[in-house]
Amino acid sequence: MSKTYKDNTPISRQKFMEELRRYQKGSVSRRHFLAVTGLGMATAVMAGAVPGLRPRKTWAAGEIGDRVILATWPNYHDPKNFEKFTEMTGANVQVNVFGSNEEMLAKLQAGGSGWDVFVPTNYTITTYVGEKLIEPLDLAKIPNYEAGAFDPRFSDAGTVDGTVFAVPKNWGTTGYVVNTKHTGGKKLSTWKEFWDLTKTEFSGRTMVHDYQLTTIGNALKYFGYSFNSVDPKELADAETLLLEVKPHLYAINSDYQPPMRNGDAWMSMAWTGDGKQLHTDIPEIEYVLGKEGGEIWSDYFAIPNGAPHRDAGYALINFLLDPAINAKEVLTHGYPVADARTNKMLPKELLEDPILYPAKDLLDALEFGAAATLTDPNRAELLARFKSA
């Protein structure tokens, strides 16, 4: 049975402190932190003793209030920028980390998220607009956003029926990372190799996302189908493959960097920035875009309807879109940005990095996620069956 991490393994003090620092930076969710450290029900007791488990210190309120709550993805920001924002405004940035767009949507649909800003992916925005979950943006409050500076491929999805609901953050691709010391030096290049290795030499060492769009989409690519397919027969083929590989997985989890770094996992579905971070730190870990195709995506900043600290939300978006601040973000997380102003500030070697900016033939084979996949019941039910098998 797949798992998040190795079960019942005692955690060392060093590992505990590493995970605590990741939690405090917003790199991982509270649920992840409690599961990995084994605190569980002890949280209430520990809250008084462990900084980061209790509410953070209230900052002196300025014009925008004392806090801003951001829902975002793992390893997707420079914590030093948040510290600078707090110094400038008095608003403390509190980060909620999520592993899928479905989680974000469900949280907003349930009401009372408490978020002021969140980071949805391109294909979800029309759903948020249709369900009146996000508000039209007042661009006068985001003077650092200059529409003309952004590549329209990665900014157009934020505008629905002529109204801007979201502004671009980063873009990237979905491929996989593989530790080549376990391939005998062989270079991988396809999704077929990913799935076939998982069933054989990499049994027990592969991770897939806890995210239906990418896990189902990349299983569909094994058969040459569209990444976004909702065709019942094609989904049935993908389910057969997923159920076949399920016993061979190390984990179903969207936070794959720790096991790839410590060697528990040898291969995992991955996003661009994680691929770049891992390859930089451990050169034998390579990022692969399957020749069959897959996903290209763009993420956005948006403000939920009813945001409790709305002015602080606008201030944070505007701050992060300052080209100099944005450049620091890119240098930290490794995801490309569509802002030409920011790109002028980045090192040439970064702009020429094949992980971040793949060859045209690889890019041309990729698909943007389709809105239909977010709410398609067949895909949601398939993922549920896969996870419970």
Please give the residue ranges for each predicted region.
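Short beta-strand->loop
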Residues: 135-146, 166, 283-295, 304-307
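Early extracytoplasmic/lumenal segment of secretory-pathway proteins
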Residues: 59-127
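N-terminal secretory signal peptides
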Residues: 1-32, 56-57
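Conserved C-terminal helix/tail region of periplasmic/extracytoplasmic solute-binding proteins
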Residues: 8-12, 16, 22, 258, ...
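Mature extracytoplasmic/periplasmic domains
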Residues: 299, 304-364
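A structural signal for short loop-to-beta-strand junctions that line the ligand-binding cleft
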Residues: 113-117, 135-139, 144-176, 204-206
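N-terminal export leaders
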Residues: 28-49
